[in-house]
C-alpha cells in the first residue's frame, strides 16, 4: 500500500494534480485558508503547500496569506460583535480564556504577533480570545496580518517543491527539523504567555 502511494508521487503525477487544482482559479486558493479560520481542524499546511505548488511560491504565498488573514479578521469581528451574548458566555468564563484575555488586553500586539508566527499555535483560539477581549481592531488586524505573513511564508518556503521534499532525504530531514523547532519554540512562547498571565492575575488578586 505504501509502495503504491509512493510510486504515485512522481513529478508527472504531482504536476498533473497541481494543474488540476490550479484550474479552479485563485478564488479557491483564497477560500480554503479563509474557511480554515472558522474550521480549525482543516489542514492549513496542506492548503498552503497546494497553493505554492500550483501557483508558484510567491503567488501561492500571497493567496494563502490573504485568505488566512481575512479569515482571522472575520472570526475576530464576528466574535467581537456577538461575543457578549449568552451563546459565548461559557467561553468567556473559562479560566484559561480569561487569563489569555487579560494578557492580550494588557500587552496587545506583541503576544498575538508571536503566537500567530508559529504554524502549530491554535490561531483560532487566539482570534476568539482577541475578539472577546478589549483590544482594538486595528492592533489585532496588524498582529494578524504580520504574524500570518511570517507563518505562511515559512510553510510556503518549506513546502514549495513537494517532489524534491519527497525524493531528497536531506531536504526532508532539514524540513522536519525546522518544523520541530518551530513547534517547540511556539509551545515555549505559548507556555510563557500563559504563565505570565497567571502571575499577573495572581498579583492583581493580592492587591
UniProtKB/Swiss-Prot annotation:
It is found in: Cell membrane. InterPro entries: TMEM64 (IPR015414), VTT_dom (IPR032816). The keyword Transmembrane applies. Pfam families: VTT_dom (PF09335). GO terms for cellular component: plasma membrane. The chain crosses the membrane at residues 28-48, 59-79, 112-132, 140-160, 165-185. This is Uncharacterized membrane protein YhjE. It is a multi-pass membrane protein. Keywords: Cell membrane, Membrane, Transmembrane, Transmembrane helix. It comes from Bacillus subtilis (strain 168).
Amino acid at each position: 500500500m505504501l509502495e503504491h502511494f509512493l510510486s504515485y508521487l512522481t513529478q508527472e503525477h504531482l504536476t498533473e494534480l497541481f494543474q488540476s487544482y490550479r484550474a479552479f482559479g485563485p478564488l479557491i486558493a483564497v477560500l480554503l485558508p479563509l474557511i480554515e479560520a472558522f474550521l480549525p481542524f482543516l489542514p492549513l499546511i496542506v492548503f498552503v503547500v497546494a497553493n505554492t505548488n500550483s501557483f508558484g511560491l510567491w503567488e501561492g504565498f500571497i493567496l494563502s496569506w490573504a485568505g488566512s488573514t481575512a479569515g482571522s479578521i472575520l472570526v475576530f469581528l464576528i466574535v467581537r460583535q456577538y461575543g457578549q451574548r449568552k451563546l459565548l458566555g461559557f467561553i468567556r468564563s473559562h479560566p484559561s480564556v480569561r487569563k489569555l484575555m487579560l494578557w492580550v488586553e494588557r500587552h496587545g500586539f506583541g503576544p498575538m504577533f508571536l503566537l500567530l508566527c508559529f504554524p502549530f499555535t491554535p490561531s483560532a483560539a487566539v482570534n476568539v480570545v482577541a475578539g472577546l477581549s478589549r483590544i482594538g481592531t486595528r492592533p489585532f488586524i496588524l498582529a494578524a496580518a504580520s504574524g500570518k505573513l511570517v507563518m505562511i511564508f515559512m510553510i510556503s518556503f518549506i513546502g514549495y517543491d513537494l517532489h524534491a521534499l519527497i525524493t531528497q532525504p536531506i531536504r526532508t530531514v532539514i524540513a522536519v527539523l525546522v518544523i520541530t523547532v518551530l513547534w517547540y519554540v511556539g509551545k515555549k512562547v505559548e507556555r510563557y504567555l500563559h504563565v505570565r498571565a497567571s502571575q499577573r492575575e495572581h498579583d492583581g488578586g493580592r492587591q
